[in-house]
Amino acid sequence: MTSGAGWEEQVFLPITNSISSEDNNQIKIGSSVSIEYNQNGQHVSQIDDKGLHNILVLTGYAIDESTGELVPTFDPCDYVKGILISGKILKGNHFKIIGIPSNKLYIIRKKDVHGNITFSLPIKNFNTGTYQVDLRDKVTSFVSLDRDVAKTIVDNVLAKIYAKIYNSLNKEQKDKLYRDVEEIFNYYSIKSLKSNP
């Protein structure tokens, strides 16, 4: 944490089937979102020898897996889980939340989170200055990560974001991290009921 006042600016990185690592400290989500992370930054979400901590759950949202953008559904049962990392959104629209008290966020596996947090969300497109979401002919569905996807996310994404800590983990601790990702991360995906959305 920085100077007791709050965290440096964070980005919400949804952990989904459509996430992949790029060169130059970048993560790609679907076709429309690219996030640059600060490898030496102070991430709200952390890993250690006991696993993954400070996972943010955004309720009332689903993810468009083709684009990687979050879509507000206004359904309290829909949610997307992800991590808060030091970085910025390079490609895609974003919505910035400034200085929200950490105790107002739905954070699971909480560890050492205090103060205010400013973060950005990769969100569905804006139209001419007005935020508009068309939920007609759309349906959300529950998605969980399988073991192979969880392993790929740990090896190709988390291992790069948290390189110093990850490289110090032994095999048993890395196996725990694989299990954490597989068991913790699930989400709702939004799709069109029409064949050509």
Curated annotation (Swiss-Prot):
Q: Where in the cell is it found?
A: Cytoplasm
Q: Source organism's superkingdom?
A: Archaea
Q: Provide this UniProt record's keywords sorted from A to Z.
A: Antiviral defense, Cytoplasm
**InterPro entries per the UniProt record, alphabetical:** Cmr7A (IPR043959), CRISPR_Cmr7_comp (IPR053743)
**Pfam families reported in the protein's UniProt record:** Cmr7A (PF19021)
An annotated GO BP: defense response to virus
Q: Does the entry feature the keyword Cytoplasm, yes or no? A: yes
Q: What is its main location?
A: cytoplasm
**Keyword Cytoplasm on entry:** yes
Q: Name one GO cellular component term.
A: cytoplasm
Function, as annotated: CRISPR (clustered regularly interspaced short palindromic repeat) is an adaptive immune system that provides protection against mobile genetic elements (viruses, transposable elements and conjugative plasmids). CRISPR clusters contain spacers, sequences complementary to antecedent mobile elements, and target invading nucleic acids. CRISPR clusters are transcribed and processed into CRISPR RNA (crRNA). The CMR complex degrades RNA complementary to the crRNA (target RNA) within UA dinucleotides, generating 3'-OH and 5'-phosphate ends.
Q: How does it assemble?
A: Possible homodimer. Part of the CMR ribonucleoprotein complex, consisting of crRNA plus Cmr1/Cmr2/Cmr3/Cmr4/Cmr5/Cmr6 at 1:1 and possibly 3 Cmr7 dimers. A Cmr2/Cmr3/Cmr7 subcomplex without crRNA can also be isolated. It does not cleave target RNA.
Q: Which family does it belong to?
A: Belongs to the CRISPR system Cmr7 family.
The name this protein goes by in its record: CRISPR system CMR subunit Cmr7 1
What organism does this protein naturally occur in? Saccharolobus solfataricus (strain ATCC 35092 / DSM 1617 / JCM 11322 / P2)
